Amino acid sequence: QIFNQTKCDGVKIEGNAELVDVIKYLTKKNIPVMAHVGLQPQKFSSASKFKIYGRKEDDLKNILNDCKALEKAGAISLLLEGILTEIATQITFASKIPTIGIGASEYCDGQILVSEDMLGMFTEYHPKFVKKYANLCSNIQNAIKRFSSEVNNNKFPNKKFRYD
């Protein structure tokens, strides 16, 4: 009911093969599911716990098996985050559904970045795979400082910005 009321196009769920039953249930209800594998930031409270997926010996086998299971369960696409290039490439070529990469190489079918990261909204930690296309944090801070200064120095508001 909520899905229909919000008019969203689908849901994204972080996890691995443990999600198979959830994905099957949702797809039976005609709710498209994007499965998010690899680095799963919503599961961590601290950026220091982020780790790149694929450095352990069993990672390749595990994630390939997870992706096959998620695809078979009905996922419409796979979001691959923070995964080594070799693994992301193998997943992309093995999958019948699109792969979307965020820190998973140019070999995925599509790419995404978190808007706040690519727009430079944060000055703290950001993953290696984030390219900043702007520095809005600095621009916003400067705008607020200018506003505050103009208010404190009685330069704003002025005649230009009032109704007489």
Q: Positions of the model-derived regions?
A:
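Alpha/beta enzyme core
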Residues: 1-164
